[in-house]
């Protein structure tokens, strides 16, 4: 295809995104991540960040990173399967196992890479994956990369999952049930107790992505700990990029499972090892989350979430089924959602409009994410702006 044709093709596709209101506008952040930040030149309250425990700019993480960089250098110099597996990475993987309360752990460059590599590694042709309707895109892509068949069950619908297991279990060798623990657009929690019972009854492997539960629920150990089913989950997936304030993905499981993943997950085998600085920061983040200070940060996080959720509800906003610091304000209209997000930013509140295809049409929303570092005046400022422009736009 000629260069001019390529340009015209994607220019046309871009125009279509603009016309449908689906173009993703990116704002420049000019300061460290925190409850407040400088975005596009103005100071704003940040309600669009995964930085739940306010650790992303913690000086202890920065010191750990600097010390590791001085000791090991910046880059690892090789893929980790060959010569990039530094001793500090082995230390991190022991910490992952401790954090996830499993026999062993493995680190991936991103959470996306953890799902995209691990899911295909676990299944073969002749296997079946049962996946929640609202699972994260990294799970969806991991399933697509596998050779297994897939069946989608209705969101958090245990009866539908049971029906699909009953009708299909005997047709396949292995069955893998995959679910988010905390769903990223609604902030609701998967019914893991019931799902775990079904996995046991039908001899299925249970894979739980706890990206938004790590460091948030279960005294920091995540959603399975919160619900008392840690030992019922076979594969524990998580991230460092949210509550832990750093970068990377992790899997915790039995030692044999982890070693098999290490030998079969292409996103691990074919990736360059992480900078030692990132690894050291991750170790420090786990230590903080598992300390008494971490528990205090989690308590403050949930107090802020409850305050803000009740505040939005009292104004007349629909917050859906949120049970976590992810608190949607569901608008149900693309144009109004974008207008509200723009108005809030002008008022000094940084939020992001979430519209189709990220969510279904008619459920467009602003996803608010509070963190442990927000002061009450930050949340009150945001609620005041929501009230002002919610009324002005006819949303409330």
What is each model feature region?
Residues 6-7, 11-72, 204:
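N-terminal "arm"/small-domain region of PLP-dependent enzymes with the aminotransferase-like
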Residues 59, 63-67, 71, 94, ...:
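PLP-dependent enzyme catalytic core of the Aspartate aminotransferase-like
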Residues 63-111:
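Conserved N-terminal alpha-helix of the aminotransferase class I/II PLP-enzyme fold
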Residues 118-137:
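Conserved PLP-anchoring active-site segment centered on the Schiff-base-forming lysine
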Residues 151, 155-208:
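Active-site phosphate-binding strand-loop segment of PLP-dependent enzymes
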Residues 219, 225-260:
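Active-site PLP attachment segment
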Residues 243-312, 317-320:
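PLP-dependent aminotransferase class I/II
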Residues 297-306, 313-348, 358, 362-363, ...:
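Conserved PLP-binding catalytic core of the aspartate aminotransferase-like
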């Amino acid at each position: 295809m000629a260069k001019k044709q390529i340009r015209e093709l994607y220019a046309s596709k871009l125009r279509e995104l603009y016309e449908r209101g689906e173009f993703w506008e990116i704002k420049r952040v000019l300061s460290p991540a925190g409850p407040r930040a400088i975005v596009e030149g103005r100071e704003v309250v940040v309600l669009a960040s995964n930085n739940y425990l306010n650790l992303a700019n913690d000086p202890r993480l920065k010191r750990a990173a600097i010390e590791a960089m001085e000791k090991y250098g910046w880059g690892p110099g090789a893929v980790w399967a060959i010569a990039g597996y530094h001793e500090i990475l082995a230390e991190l993987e022991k910490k992952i196992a401790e954090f996830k309360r499993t026999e062993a752990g493995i680190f991936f460059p991103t959470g996306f890479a953890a799902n995209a590599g691990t899911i295909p590694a676990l299944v073969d042709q002749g296997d079946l994956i049962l996946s929640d309707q609202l699972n994260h895109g990294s799970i969806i892509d991991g399933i697509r990369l596998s050779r297994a068949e897939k069946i989608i069950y209705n969101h958090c619908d245990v009866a539908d999952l049971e029906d699909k297991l009953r009708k299909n279990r005997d047709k396949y060798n292995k069955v893998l049930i995959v679910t988010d623990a905390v769903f990223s657009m609604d902030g609701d929690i998967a019914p893991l107790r019931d799902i775990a019972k079904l996995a046991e009854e039908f001899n299925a492997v249970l894979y739980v992505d706890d990206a938004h539960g790590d460091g948030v629920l279960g005294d920091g150990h995540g959603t399975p700990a919160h619900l008392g089913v840690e030992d019922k989950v076979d594969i524990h997936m998580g991230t460092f990029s949210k509550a832990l304030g750093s970068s990377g993905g992790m899997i915790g499981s039995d030692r044999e499972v982890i070693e098999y993943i290490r030998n079969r997950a292409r996103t691990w085998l074919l990736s360059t090892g992480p900078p030692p600085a990132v690894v050291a920061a991750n170790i420090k983040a786990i230590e903080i989350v598992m300390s008494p200070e971490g528990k205090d940060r989690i308590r403050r996080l949930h107090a802020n979430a409850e305050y803000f959720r009740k505040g939005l509800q009292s104004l007349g906003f629909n917050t859906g089924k949120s049970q976590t610091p992810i608190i949607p304000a569901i608008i149900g209209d693309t144009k109004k959602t974008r207008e509200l997000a723009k108005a809030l930013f002008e008022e000094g509140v940084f939020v992001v409009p979430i519209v189709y295809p990220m969510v279904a049409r008619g459920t467009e929303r602003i996803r608010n994410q509070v963190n442990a570092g927000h002061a009450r005046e930050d949340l009150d400022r945001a609620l005041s702006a929501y009230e002002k422009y919610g009324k002005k736009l006819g949303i409330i």
